[in-house]
Amino acid sequence: MTVLLALDGVACIRGDRLVFEELSLALNRGDALWVRGPNGAGKSSLIRLAAGLLRPAAGRVVRRGRIALIDEAAALDSELPLRRALDFWARVDTVDGHAVDRAMDMMALNTLADVPVAMLSTGQRRRAAMVRVIASGAPIWLLDEPANGMDQAATARLVAAIATHRANGGAVLLASHFALAIPDLDELVMGVLA
């Protein structure tokens, strides 16, 4: 097995609060891990640590391959039409337009290509964020509440995209308050430390 993402004895401190400690995990090609727990348990902090946006207070994080991240913000220019906003990130991520086309089709956003990002619903913005993740070609997906605002059909598309990514050898670390119908999903339950 090829490990794409590993955390070894990781601790996270935010402000003066210990969020979690001695956390270890490994994601191999084809793996998916659902991180769940109450608000404040450290789900988003774990995603940010895995992405390299936070430094662990202890332990180490090893990434083998590029990452693609969804967090609370879609990071799309709200004034641009959706397709132009996605094309900007495609250039940053050095992805060709065909990958964006395929990802937009996968997330059923082609009909919204000319709509300004500011006019999209929350669920549509989450789907747009998934387009960027899918098109990136990154083997490691870090998804923080990716289904927020999505209806049942959009959630099914998200689940299908995750399944395709895993079948192609990718790994997914998914933080979510609610379960998604993803087969063979490992689970990490995080709690609040006293």
From Swiss-Prot:
<dbReference type="GO" id="GO:0005524">
    <property type="term" value="F:ATP binding"/>
</dbReference>
<dbReference type="GO" id="GO:0015439">
    <property type="term" value="F:ABC-type heme transporter activity"/>
</dbReference>
<dbReference type="InterPro" id="IPR003593">
    <property type="entry name" value="AAA+_ATPase"/>
</dbReference>
<keyword id="KW-0997">Cell inner membrane</keyword>
<dbReference type="InterPro" id="IPR027417">
    <property type="entry name" value="P-loop_NTPase"/>
</dbReference>
<keyword id="KW-0813">Transport</keyword>
<keyword id="KW-1278">Translocase</keyword>
<keyword id="KW-0547">Nucleotide-binding</keyword>
<keyword id="KW-1003">Cell membrane</keyword>
<keyword id="KW-0472">Membrane</keyword>
<dbReference type="Pfam" id="PF00005">
    <property type="entry name" value="ABC_tran"/>
</dbReference>
<dbReference type="GO" id="GO:0005886">
    <property type="term" value="C:plasma membrane"/>
</dbReference>
<keyword id="KW-0201">Cytochrome c-type biogenesis</keyword>
<dbReference type="InterPro" id="IPR005895">
    <property type="entry name" value="ABC_transptr_haem_export_CcmA"/>
</dbReference>
<comment type="function">
    <text>Part of the ABC transporter complex CcmAB involved in the biogenesis of c-type cytochromes; once thought to export heme, this seems not to be the case, but its exact role is uncertain. Responsible for energy coupling to the transport system.</text>
</comment>
<protein>
    <recommendedName>
        <fullName>Cytochrome c biogenesis ATP-binding export protein CcmA</fullName>
        <ecNumber>7.6.2.5</ecNumber>
    </recommendedName>
</protein>
<keyword id="KW-0067">ATP-binding</keyword>
<dbReference type="GO" id="GO:0016887">
    <property type="term" value="F:ATP hydrolysis activity"/>
</dbReference>
<comment type="similarity">
    <text>Belongs to the ABC transporter superfamily. CcmA exporter (TC 3.A.1.107) family.</text>
</comment>
<dbReference type="GO" id="GO:0017004">
    <property type="term" value="P:cytochrome complex assembly"/>
</dbReference>
<feature type="domain" description="ABC transporter">
    <location>
        <begin position="5"/>
        <end position="194"/>
    </location>
</feature>
<feature type="binding site">
    <location>
        <begin position="37"/>
        <end position="44"/>
    </location>
    <ligand>
        <name>ATP</name>
    </ligand>
</feature>
<dbReference type="InterPro" id="IPR003439">
    <property type="entry name" value="ABC_transporter-like_ATP-bd"/>
</dbReference>
<comment type="subunit">
    <text>The complex is composed of two ATP-binding proteins (CcmA) and two transmembrane proteins (CcmB).</text>
</comment>
